[in-house]
């Protein structure tokens, strides 16, 4: 019953009346003092200027994490790994309404909802044009809808990152503008393992994964390693100063 209730909430939340821009602005203003301090510290720890020009979120279904990258005018810089507390389904794209799969692809954030049942939420443009095209070829009239990145630690087909972390992401996207944020969702980290497509997958999944792999190439693991080393040094220095 709990799973059914969560699934219904994930479907129905976007069907409710969304906040007008004034409500969104009011929420951003309310969040601003805490989020400016938190994000400034987070970006400084990564050695990245704040605020950034653009951001990219990379959701890894296996391992359940959400990477935040920022563009500094020359290249993408890694900022932080956020945990994904809940993401139902398994490897493979979303195919139909109610399959409880998190989609796979490149998406944009198209709505901010400060009145979400999941604290705050950001709606993705799933299904995008590619998703619709594959559904049409296969005769799938309802490929699904209403996919969000949201707060709370429970979800059914969306990405739940917890209330604290969704505040950071919601504020950052609101501050920069939704057109300055992309979301890449992959089944696992193609930078670490060879791409493998399940034998029962539609033929187009291999093409999709090849495309996503090309996009991931702009976000090298070496950049993450460098940030980790920087952060560890900074943390050790802070402890040393405190002593």
Where are these regions (language model features)?
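Tryptophan-centered short beta-strand motifs
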Residues: 75-78
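N-terminal signal peptide c-region/cleavage motif recognized by signal peptidases
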Residues: 12-14
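Extracellular/luminal recognition modules and glycoprotein regions
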Residues: 20-50
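Exported/periplasmic cell-wall-interacting domains
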Residues: 98-107, 111-242
């Amino acid at each position: 019953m709990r799973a059914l209730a969560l699934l219904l909430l994930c479907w129905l939340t976007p069907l409710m009346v969304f906040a007008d821009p004034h409500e969104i602005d009011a929420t951003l203003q309310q969040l601003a003092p805490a989020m400016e301090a938190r994000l400034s510290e987070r970006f400084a720890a990564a050695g990245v200027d704040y605020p950034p020009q653009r951001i990219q979120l990379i959701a890894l279904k296996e391992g359940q994490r959400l990477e935040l990258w920022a563009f500094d005018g020359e290249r993408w810089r890694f900022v932080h790994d956020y945990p994904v507390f809940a993401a139902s389904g398994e490897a493979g794209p979303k195919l139909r309404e109610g399959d409880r799969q998190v989609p796979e692809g490149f998406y944009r954030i198209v709505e901010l909802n400060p009145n979400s049942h999941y604290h705050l939420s950001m709606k993705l443009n799933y299904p995008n044009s590619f998703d619709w095209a594959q559904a049409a070829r296969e005769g799938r009239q309802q490929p699904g809808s209403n996919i969000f990145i949201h707060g709370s630690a429970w979800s059914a087909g969306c990405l739940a990152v917890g209330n604290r972390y969704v505040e950071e992401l919601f504020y950052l996207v609101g501050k920069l503008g939704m057109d300055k944020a992309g979301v890449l969702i992959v089944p696992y980290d193609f930078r670490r393992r060879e791409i493998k497509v399940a034998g029962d997958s539609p033929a187009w999944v291999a093409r999709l994964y090849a495309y996503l792999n090309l996009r991931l190439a702009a976000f090298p693991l070496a950049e993450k390693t460098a940030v980790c080393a920087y952060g560890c040094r900074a943390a050790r220095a802070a402890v040393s100063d405190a002593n």
